[in-house]
């Protein structure tokens, strides 16, 4: 109602101003034709004027034929003598002046207009939901609307333990006496920790949908922006809003943007982010009570958060939200598949087994890609084949059918990928090969993909050395068969070297150097750690480490070489099969490894088989080479052109290696994902 009257008064003022301006610039003119003073004087001299009315310097009159007219008289000209001399009736009137109020309004109108515009902009800057320039000290926390689409815990699957902990917080808000009668206190803060895409923000939205209390949400980057000093003010305002709406929940997404370890930057205590963090620490557990305000935050970098932020009393609970296991993946797939029309052949458990390391967001994307692929083919339901194609697209990238590659490079790529596959299948305990292809995907010319039989969280020394041998298989196949070395194995060598060095320096897998950690963990500057790195390895120890790394790589290089030498016939058969079909699956690889000829080992081609369309054998200039994006424990091996392309190869070992790193070092988890 107030808004109605405000708008009504605004339109009334606008209408009044328009009337004033109209009256000002469109003053009514007297009746009759306006003539020049010369014509008027001539008419008087000829006796054609019978009567006139003088209003200041304006003269109005009637001619002898009865027509009215008007004219202007020059200043300091005595008109009355001429008029009296010719017998013209004269009537003198005071000129119609502008009313006093109108004169005041006209004189003050520009100033009043400027004042009104200034007031308008000041009100706009001080309001507008925190978006005004004068509201930079106001919190940008948004209150979740009741009209927003609600998410409940039934929409969250695959992370049951995290759901249970957060459901307890919701129950406390709904029925606090149940816990208080035994002396229990509600947690002041809950920190959701986990890799990207695991459902941390979705859990927060589920809390908002279940708690039935005010829910404020904002990002960690909303505190520190353009102006200096507003971060602390926004924190204070955020908690003021929370206290007014208590009991309530405040959710801060990506809290590492504001909660990083203090002392990392060059600004010291005057750093804007540190000032904001200090205010956040005080508000969460300081002199003033924040009873009824529960903080929920999410981050995928808990290692860089300030210890004072993580202590009990601030974030009492740290809820880990990991990547789902096979059971969790099955549940997540079923949640997303409920929104898609499916064929009877689709089995969520089979898809879950083939997607180890996938997060909830990855699985949602997989279902969406499968639906898009089916829609492009004008299907009425999504079939299992669509999910298989979507999985290949997500893991390996979209096939580049337009890429033109010379026959020589195709042959090099085929032997490179066959080398990886033969070594992987020959090693006992290695992850089985799922698919081998020389179809360019993304920025890769080919790849070998392995899938583990089950979820894997740790790796033994034997498995890591097997991975190094698999990495060496591509280069060795080129060397043994084609008698050449290409840049395609460059990334294989780099990853094998990195893995061997981690085995020595991080995992203590050296017989001579012992179970020790050598060198500081690699930390990025400004991420909550010291700027300088202290060297903790002597030159003698560094030489011994280099020797150990070389020994591990060389030993597995020779191991892979022996395997390929013994399986040379299989290597030739598999490479020829790749040149013919471009893609072979797990069953075909197993039959080829058993010594079956390609004629019986390879499946008949389908009409729409992706292997039926081969790239034109024309010289290609690939230019840039990059890594293949794959999931944890998922394989990919890339071979590049021998002449002008910088090598960059990725095999299953890379994914396995990075998963090992992610289990033992938090920074490895972030880099991998």
Swiss-Prot record:
One of the GO BP terms on file: proteolysis
Binding site for Zn(2+): 416, 420, 492
UniProt-listed Enzyme Commission number(s): 3.4.24.-
Cofactor: Zn(2+)
Matches recorded under PANTHER family: ATP-DEPENDENT ZINC METALLOPROTEASE YME1L1, METALLOPROTEASE M41 FTSH
KW Nucleotide-binding (keyword) present: yes
SUPFAM superfamilies per the UniProt record, alphabetical: FtsH protease domain-like (SSF140990), P-loop containing nucleoside triphosphate hydrolases (SSF52540)
Descriptive protein name: ATP-dependent zinc metalloprotease FtsH
Polar residues bias spans: 648-660
Cytoplasmic side: 1-7, 122-673
Residues the entry annotates as binding ATP: 194-201
Quaternary data: Homohexamer.
Cofactor, free-text remark: Binds 1 zinc ion per subunit.
Assigned protein family: In the central section; belongs to the AAA ATPase family. In the C-terminal section; belongs to the peptidase M41 family.
Residues annotated as transmembrane: 8-28, 101-121
Annotated Basic and acidic residues bias: 661-673
Region annotation (Disordered) ranges: 601-673
PROSITE patterns: AAA (PS00674)
CDD domains: RecA-like_FtsH
């Amino acid at each position: 109602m107030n808004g109605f009257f405000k708008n009504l008064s605004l339109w009334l003022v606008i209408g009044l101003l328009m009337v004033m301006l109209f009256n000002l610039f469109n003053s009514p003119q007297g009746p009759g034709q306006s003539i020049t003073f010369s014509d008027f004087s001539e008419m008087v001299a000829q006796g054609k004027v019978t009567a006139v009315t003088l209003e200041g310097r304006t003269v109005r009159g009637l001619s002898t034929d009865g027509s009215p007219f008007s004219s202007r008289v020059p200043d300091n000209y005595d008109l009355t003598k001429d008029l009296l001399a010719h017998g013209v009736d004269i009537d003198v009137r005071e000129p119609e002046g502008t009313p006093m109020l109108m004169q005041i309004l006209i004189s003050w109108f520009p100033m009043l207009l400027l004042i009104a515009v200034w007031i308008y902009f000041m009100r706009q800057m001080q309001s507008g939901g925190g978006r005004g320039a004068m509201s930079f000290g106001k919190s940008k926390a948004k209150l979740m609307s009741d009209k927003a689409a609600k998410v409940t815990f039934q929409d969250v699957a695959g992370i049951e333990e995290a759901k249970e902990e957060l459901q307890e917080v919701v129950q406390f808000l709904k029925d606090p006496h149940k816990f208080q009668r035994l002396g229990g206190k509600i947690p002041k803060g809950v920190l959701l920790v986990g890799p990207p895409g695991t459902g941390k923000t979705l859990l927060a939205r589920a809390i908002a949908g279940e708690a039935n209390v005010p829910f404020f949400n904002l990002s960690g980057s909303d505190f520190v922006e353009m102006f200096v000093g507003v971060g602390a003010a926004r924190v204070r305002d955020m908690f003021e809003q929370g206290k007014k709406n208590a009991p309530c929940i405040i959710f801060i997404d990506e809290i590492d943007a504001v909660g990083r370890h203090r002392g990392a930057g060059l600004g010291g205590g005057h750093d804007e982010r540190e000032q904001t963090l200090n205010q956040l620490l005080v508000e969460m557990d300081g002199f003033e009570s924040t009873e009824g305000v529960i903080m929920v935050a999410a981050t995928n970098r808990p290692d860089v958060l300030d210890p004072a932020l993580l202590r009990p009393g601030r974030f009492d609970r740290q809820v880990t939200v990991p990547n789902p296991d096979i059971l969790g993946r099955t549940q997540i797939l079923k949640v997303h598949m409920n929104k898609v029309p499916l064929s009877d052949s689709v089995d969520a458990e089979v898809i879950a087994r083939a997607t180890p390391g996938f997060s909830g967001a990855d699985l949602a994307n997989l279902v969406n890609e499968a639906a898009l692929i089916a829609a492009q083919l004008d299907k009425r339901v999504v079939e299992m084949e669509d999910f298989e194609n979507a999985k290949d697209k997500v893991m390996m990238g979209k096939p580049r059918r337009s890429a033109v590659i010379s026959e020589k490079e195709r042959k090099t790529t085929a032997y490179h990928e066959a080398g990886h596959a033969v070594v992987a299948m020959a090693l006992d305990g290695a992850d089985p090969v799922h698919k081998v292809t020389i179809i360019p995907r993304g920025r890769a010319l080919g790849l070998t993909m392995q899938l583990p039989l089950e979820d894997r969280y740790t790796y033994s020394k034997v498995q890591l050395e097997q991975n190094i041998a698999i990495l060496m298989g591509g280069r060795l196949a080129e060397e043994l068969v084609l008698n050449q070395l290409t840049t395609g194995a460059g990334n294989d060598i780099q990853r094998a070297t990195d893995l061997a060095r981690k085995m020595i320096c991080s995992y203590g897998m050296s017989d001579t150097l012992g179970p020790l950690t050598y060198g500081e963990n690699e930390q990025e500057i400004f991420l909550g750690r010291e700027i300088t790195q202290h060297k903790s390895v002597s030159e003698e120890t560094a030489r011994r480490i280099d020797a150990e790394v070389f020994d591990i790589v060389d030993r597995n290089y020779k191991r892979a070489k022996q395997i390929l030498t013994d399986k040379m016939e299989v290597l030739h058969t598999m490479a020829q099969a790749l040149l013919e079909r471009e893609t072979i699956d797990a069953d075909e690889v197993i039959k080829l490894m058993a010594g079956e000829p390609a004629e019986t080992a390879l499946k008949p081609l389908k009409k729409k088989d992706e292997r039926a369309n081969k790239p034109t054998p024309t010289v290609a200039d690939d230019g840039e080479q990059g890594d293949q994006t794959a999931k944890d424990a998922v394989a990919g091996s890339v071979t590049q052109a021998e002449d002008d392309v910088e090598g960059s190869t990725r095999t299953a070992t890379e994914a396995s290696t990075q998963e090992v790193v992610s289990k033992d070092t938090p920074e490895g988890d972030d880099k991998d994902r």
